[in-house]
Amino acid sequence: MKAYLEAQEVALMEKATINLRDRLLVRLLFHLGCRVSEALALTVEDVDLGRSTITIKHLKARLKLSCINCGQRLGRSHVFCPKCGGRVEKAQTEQQERHRQRVLPVDGDTLSMLKDYIRRGGPVVRDGKRLIFGINRHRAWQIIRGCAEKAGLPKLVNPETGTIHNVSPHRLRDAFAVHAVKLDDSGDGLRLLQEHLGHASFDTTAKYRKVAGEELKNWYARLWNKKVRSDEQKSDGH
């Protein structure tokens, strides 16, 4: 049983979608390798059509602010540092918040799909924000699982735990990472992948090298299984 999706299988999922919104969701999760929470938080303003980039806001961990003078942890409402009494300047807070974002390049085909989606009025206005998708996490899971089933894709196995699970939004992020590692598993390549995925730890990124290595192990196993069967057939023939 497979541990991850191939690019061709993700393409089948795209074809299995019933509308442009769902197709764009599948494409962004795979081509950006972003988390589903990050994709659902995307706004029209996060898309820079001129530079062909998308700004992803880190949502996995709560934003941590600290005083640049003494290192004291700060809350968003703090005007003065409770430890050293220093004034918390707005510019200082904004500079620290920028570390919780990453700007990702977007390929031409995905950018064209985004342009078409925005032009057709796909984004949803909510709380003053023009959200790209305007759906919740549960609905996103339903869409991805439904597309995978419609495309005839099998369930996947977790290479770390051995558990079997349906195709989910995070499996598209995994597919992007494994696809990238197959093309470049050098130290520099993994560092770039770490930055792209927004991993705080390099070890989290490096695990995809191990997952990609499963392909070689499976090939080797099939090779010997075929040889054993062939030898057995010859033996039976004598």
Model-derived segments and spans:
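Conserved tyrosine-mediated DNA breakage-rejoining catalytic core shared by Y-recombinases
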Residues: 41-116
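Basic, Lys/Arg- and aromatic-enriched nucleic-acid-binding interface segment
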Residues: 3, 7-32, 36, 125, ...
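Short, leucine-enriched amphipathic alpha-helices that occur as contiguous helical runs
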Residues: 10, 21-23, 137, 141, ...
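Short, basic (Lys/Arg/His-rich) helix/loop patches that form interaction surfaces
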Residues: 122-128, 142-195
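Short, basic, alpha-helical segments at the C-terminal edge of helix-turn-helix-like DNA-binding modules
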Residues: 175, 221-227
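Catalytic-site neighborhood detector that most strongly recognizes the C-terminal catalytic loop/helix
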Residues: 197-222
